């Protein structure tokens, strides 16, 4: 009797091996129905029943059979009671494929407690957190992602950026401009010194019609380092003290040289203070450095205000010709 049962189990083992081998070929061919059938048929006798059930679950999910996928997952959990990590990873992957993002996130939160540096857990958690807008949780796993080297430095940087912008938008949506300002004050100095975040914050404040704080952030940012993104924001701030911005711009010109951008921005600040002649001078300087349709239009306005209509008309013509040259098809 013992020999007979040994012969039977050996035969089943060999058949399971053959089925597993055939299943891998079908997997390469993309035939998920056959993959699932072959892997699950003698899974209990396979060399690694857990792997068979998990692959069968994924194959069933690939062809949209959620009931079979769940059955294979439950069976995998039974055959491998002492190590549930592979089962839960597969479960999370299947939930994400079904767009059940919150359930996947719950599953991954639990996995991160037991396997905080597991590359696949981190990769799936990134996906689940992005899909559910769990920005704080995403920020929290970035150090582990860095240590586990699951992605590039650039991708980590992009994720960090997205997470902070997501948190900023959340604060704005939930508590409006006051909540956003409070949120900003609560951040670390390092965060508040990130230029991309400063730019996003100022854009929000301009939208909320809070020029005072917008100006404070831009000026603090420029004090820390010169960045064209901050300079480009200045004309959009409806400043209660344009002379303060003018002073800062002149300082930037002394430090970094009179670039076309700095000249043009200074011209716009001078126009706000009705300093038409001074504004015309700096717009001219900017145009000597390079042609620009906006600068031609602003310079024409300055000439109008100082009683020089012919020169104003000439500048408008130059601006129009430039536009036509830049867009020949229109």
Where are these regions (language model features)?
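Alpha-helical segment of the N-proximal tetratricopeptide repeat
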Residues: 12-48, 55, 62-65, 90, ...
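Residue at a conserved register position within TPR or TPR-like alpha-solenoid repeats
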Residues: 26, 60, 95, 125, ...
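TPR-repeat structural position
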Residues: 32-33, 66-67, 101, 135, ...
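Alpha-solenoid helical repeat scaffolds
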Residues: 51-55, 71, 85-90, 106, ...
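Alpha-helical adaptor scaffolds
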Residues: 57-61, 74-77, 84-93, 160-169, ...
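TPR/TPR-like (Sel1-like) alpha-helical repeat modules
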Residues: 79, 113-114, 126-151, 215, ...
């Amino acid at each position: 009797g013992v020999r007979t049962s040994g012969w039977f189990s050996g035969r089943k083992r060999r058949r399971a091996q053959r089925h597993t081998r055939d299943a891998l070929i079908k997997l390469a061919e993309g035939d998920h129905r056959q993959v699932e059938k072959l892997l699950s048929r003698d899974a209990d006798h396979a060399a690694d029943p857990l792997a068979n059930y998990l692959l069968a679950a994924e194959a069933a999910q690939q062809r949209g059979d959620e009931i079979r996928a769940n059955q294979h997952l439950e069976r995998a959990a039974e055959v491998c009671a002492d190590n549930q990590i592979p089962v839960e990873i597969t479960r999370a992957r299947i939930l994400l494929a079904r767009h059940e993002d919150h359930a996947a996130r719950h599953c991954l939160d639990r996995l991160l407690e037991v396997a905080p540096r597991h590359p696949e857990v981190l990769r799936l958690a990134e996906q689940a957190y992005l899909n559910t807008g769990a920005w704080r949780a995403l920020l929290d796993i970035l150090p582990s992602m860095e240590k586990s080297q699951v992605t590039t430095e650039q991708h980590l940087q992009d994720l960090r950026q997205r997470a902070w912008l997501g948190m900023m938008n959340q604060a704005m949506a939930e508590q409006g401009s006051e909540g956003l300002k409070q949120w900003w004050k609560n951040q670390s100095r390092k965060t508040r010194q990130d230029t991309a975040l400063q730019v996003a914050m100022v854009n929000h404040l301009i939208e909320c019609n809070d020029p005072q704080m917008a100006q404070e952030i831009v000026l603090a940012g420029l004090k820390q380092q010169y960045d064209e993104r901050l300079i480009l924001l200045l004309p959009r701030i409806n400043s209660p003290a344009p002379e303060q911005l003018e002073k800062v711009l002149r300082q930037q010109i002394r430090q970094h040289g009179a670039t076309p951008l700095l000249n043009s921005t200074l011209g716009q600040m001078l126009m706000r203070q009705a300093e038409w002649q001074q504004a015309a001078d700096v717009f001219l300087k900017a145009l000597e450095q390079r042609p620009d349709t906006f600068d031609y239009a602003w310079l024409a306005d300055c000439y109008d205000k100082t009683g020089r209509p012919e020169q104003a008309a000439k500048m408008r013509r130059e601006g129009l010709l430039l536009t036509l040259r830049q867009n020949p098809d229109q």
